[in-house]
Amino acid sequence: MNRRNFIKRSTAITGGLALSGFGSTLLSGSDNLPFKISLAEWSLHRALGKKEINHLDFAAIAKKEFGISAVEYVNTFFFEKANDHKYLSEMKRRVDDLGSKSLLIMCDNEGNLGDPDNKKRAQAIENHYKWTEAAKYLGCHSIRVNARSEGSWDDQIELAADGLRRLNEFGDSIGINTIVENHGGLSSNGKWLSAVMERVDHSRVGTLPDFGNFRIQGDEWYDRYQGMKELMPYAKAVSAKSHEFDEKGNETGSDFYRIMNIVLDAGYKGYVGIEYEGSVHTEMEGIRLTNNLLKIIRDSI
């Protein structure tokens, strides 16, 4: 979809929503913007890994370098601090002082909630409790988890649904959502992950559709546009994954206009999180390019 067609579609949608009386509801979470922009910490994973920047400075970098006031954490950058109240308090203080928001924690290296081994699955569930509590303390709405599994199509649905359902019993008790990203294996198959969502069938369990993470394995890819359509009905967050950009400022692997069309058509009114993962541009440049593209799309509506 080109920009002209996107503008026409967006104008029709926003006009129709206003006439129906639903427009104010759709936009209320975004201060009269069709969507707000957040920054995922993974966008700076190389700098963080090299200790060029400190995790505690992430929110300040988002605000001061990019004008972004909402952040999404990755647990591996403060992996030993989930139960460190002093550290979490410092994180919270810095975000509050900036007038920013903590949205979610992306959780990795804690096991797979769909593990076919009952003991490993139970351990993975338990491993996520501390991150659920940390998310609550920081003011986040969700933790992002991995539902990777093994076995047949149906077996993996049942296993992943079991792990999510059991973890959600804890998350729901303290008001934290449990959301699944398309993150490899069958989780990158939109039809499969949608089936998992239907199987769990709980308002606090949802998806985090990622524009680019539709690689199932090796050279096997799921159609990203079809996948986004299938996952958006359950979305509680969205990741604008980006890699490289052309001379016009467009992302070369994903048609951002087309995907944002899908996102808005689903009635989504939350944050769209920048998640730059490219190698041609520096991380700072990649974040700026992604931010600029999302702003152009937003301003076109």
Residue ranges and their predicted role:
Residues 2-137, 155, 172, 202, ...:
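N-terminal pre-domain/capping segments
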Residues 55, 124, 160, 224, ...:
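Short, conserved glycine- and acidic-residue-centered signature motifs
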Residues 70-71, 164-261:
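Acidic/histidine-rich catalytic cores of soluble enzymes
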Residues 71, 103-105, 143, 178, ...:
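Hydrophobic residues within beta-strands of alpha/beta enzymes
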Residues 100, 176, 266-270:
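A short helix->loop->beta-strand "cap" motif at the edges of active sites that frequently abuts
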Residues 135-154, 179-183:
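Active-site groove signature of glycoside hydrolases
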Residues 150-164:
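Active-site cleft segment of glycoside hydrolase catalytic domains centered on the general acid/base Glu
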Residues 240, 270-277:
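Conserved active-site loop/cleft motifs that coordinate metal ions or position small ligands
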